Amino acid sequence: IDNLHKAGVKDIVVVGGYKADVLKKHLERYNGITFVENSRYAETNNMYSLYLALKHTEGSGFLLMNADVYFDANIIAGLLEKDKEGNSLIACDRSGYLEESMKIATDENGKIKHISKQIAEDEYYAVSIDVYKLNADAAGILSREIYDTIEVKKSENLWTEVALDAIFSKTVFAPYEICGRWFEIDNHDDLRRAEQIFKGDVI
């Protein structure tokens, strides 16, 4: 949130599940935060959390990110600056293949054609850092895909990237190669490593 504020983003929706009351209390220190609770967090996934938040996007484009990734503020600033061209973007890191992370593959024109954890090393272009910028067109297409997945197909325990992967043939996404530090925090060991990487910052 601090990084978003530094980049000039003020209208923020946070979706929480586990210990939602603690998170909501923590967010009271900020202005302009809309909190949405996913009370079914134990049986759903992040696509369902986004589904709950979509009514707050009002048909506009938006930034989408996972809260377990910590990164430099300049990554968001760069993404928004690049967005002046009107593209939908996926922030990505080309420094190395990470087995457990989402990867992207691109077509011959450099546009993203696939996102998945299962993309092989000889086919991937970069690792996604789970930060996405959607223009209004892409946001609308993604919203319809998510509504269809959850309300019609009744598939509630899927990653958002499953829906993203399904819309690349309908709208254009380009990779945004980051310049800055980032780290995904899944456990206490990861948190300790992140504290070393971002030493001097508040995590």
Task: For the regions a language model picked out, list residue spans one by one.
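Short loop/edge segments at beta-strand edges and connector loops
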Residues: G16, E37-S39, N66, A73, ...
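Structural beta-sheet core signal
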Residues: V13-V14, L63-L64, I90, P175
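Conserved N-terminal catalytic core of the sugar/cofactor nucleotidyltransferase
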Residues: I1-G61, V152
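Conserved alpha/beta core of the MobA/IspD/sugar-nucleotide pyrophosphorylase nucleotidyltransferase superfamily
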Residues: Y125-I203
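Short beta-strand-to-loop acidic/aromatic patch adjacent to the donor-nucleotide binding site
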Residues: S60-Y70
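Conserved core of the sugar-phosphate nucleotidyltransferase
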Residues: D72-E151
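Conserved beta-strand segments of alpha/beta enzyme cores
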Residues: G32-T34, K111, V172-A174
